[in-house]
């Protein structure tokens, strides 16, 4: 009897050590390998195309186009407008920028209203999310389109949480002009701006947003007129503003261009292609979407690109690379076969962030926004912009 009891306890102990049927081992990534399949913590390929990052209270959130299902070319198409049905905007979260947890579809498609901007038959691209310190709202801006790309509008959604669900507010043409490839940027003083391709993608607009980040104030500038720039990605470094952008060659890659300005609404000057290494003249066969400063690591930034696969958009890949800053003021984005964001910036000086007080190498400091002069914007163009005859992906 005693032996039976001992064996029973031994069997129970073994059963307790076995993993539950509901428990799934998490996938751990060892490094970022640009252009290769990147899996989330559940072992599924990350699906967040044309997106951007948001850093909030110690966590990074990655938002992007959730492309699912068959990629099709409509029968009426006269250009390569490959598409998948709109599923929505996805969100992933991470502490280390390497291992990402799927948080779900935070802005889902609206399937029961064919006229809705988010109906599966429409187009939803380039979602970006910013946080409004005044309203405590998370605000999403995106490029929304009709199936034939004639709408050319910006769509806005809001949420009380970074993981949604976001409530769709509506769409419009900012300042009466077309809005396609776009991003949003919040300056140190809390002012937010939308950067977007307009005038049939010939000109890039910069539009100041209202204090709630929900619409334009009416102040904007026209930049790179008739130079056909798209896929803007904006960051601030050493007191200056930088914009990475792409040419307009459809789904095909082209050379990247970096521009710099002393103020967002001021003069932008192109300074060349920052990419170096194999296929740098093709932006590593990818296209810019966002640049994220890495909080807690000083002058550390990641440039995010999409490597589009036009006939299988769900399988489009991500190319993430760290920026390098030379002592002579140059900025480059060198190709890397693999790299680890957890160790990339070791020794650059760590920051520990708290509410109101920050630590720099263990010593408290307060970050105060500097006053900046914003030049009066050029005279606005008329609102009767012609419909788009061709969309460049």
Task: Show the residue positions of the predicted features.
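Enrichment for repetitive, rod-forming helical segments
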Residues: 9-11, 314, 370
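Carbohydrate-active catalytic/glycan-binding domains of CAZyme proteins
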Residues: 25-361, 373
């Amino acid at each position: 009897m005693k032996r039976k009891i001992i064996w029973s306890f031994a069997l129970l102990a073994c059963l307790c050590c076995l993993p539950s049927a509901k428990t799934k081992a998490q996938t751990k990534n060892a490094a970022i390998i640009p252009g290769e399949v990147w899996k989330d913590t559940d072992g599924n390929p990350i699906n967040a195309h044309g997106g951007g990052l948001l850093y909030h209270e110690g966590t990074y959130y990655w938002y992007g186009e959730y492309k699912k299902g068959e990629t099709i070319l409509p029968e009426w198409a006269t250009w390569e407008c490959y598409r998948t049905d709109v599923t929505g905007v996805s969100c992933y979260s991470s502490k280390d920028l390497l291992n990402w947890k799927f948080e779900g579809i935070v802005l889902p498609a609206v399937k029961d209203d064919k006229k809705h901007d988010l109906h599966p038959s429409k187009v939803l691209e380039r979602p970006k999310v910013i946080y409004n310190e005044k309203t405590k709202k998370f605000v999403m801006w995106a490029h929304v389109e009709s199936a034939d790309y004639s709408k050319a509008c910006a769509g806005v959604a809001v949420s009380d949480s970074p993981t949604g669900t976001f409530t769709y507010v509506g769409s419009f043409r900012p300042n009466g002009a077309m809005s396609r490839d776009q991003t949003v940027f919040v300056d140190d003083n809390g002012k937010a701006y939308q950067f977007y391709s307009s005038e049939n993608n010939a000109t890039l607009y910069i539009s100041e947003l209202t204090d709630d980040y929900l619409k334009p104030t009416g102040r904007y500038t026209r930049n790179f007129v008739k130079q056909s720039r798209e896929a803007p990605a904006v960051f601030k470094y050493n007191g200056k503003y930088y914009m990475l952008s792409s040419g307009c060659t459809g789904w095909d890659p082209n050379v990247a261009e970096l521009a710099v300005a002393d103020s967002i609404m001021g003069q932008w000057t192109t300074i060349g292609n920052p990419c170096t290494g194999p296929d740098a003249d093709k932006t590593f066969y990818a296209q810019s979407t966002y640049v994220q400063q890495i909080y807690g690591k000083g002058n550390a930034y990641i440039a995010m690109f999409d490597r589009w696969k036009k006939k299988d958009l769900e399988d489009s890949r991500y190319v993430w690379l760290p920026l390098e800053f030379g002592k002579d003021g140059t900025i480059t984005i060198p190709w890397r076969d693999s790299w680890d964001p957890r160790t990339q910036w070791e020794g650059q000086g760590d920051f520990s962030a708290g509410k109101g007080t920050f630590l720099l190498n263990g010593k408290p400091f307060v970050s105060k926004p500097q006053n900046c002069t914003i030049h009066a914007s050029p005279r606005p163009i008329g609102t009767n912009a012609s419909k788009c005859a061709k969309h460049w992906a």
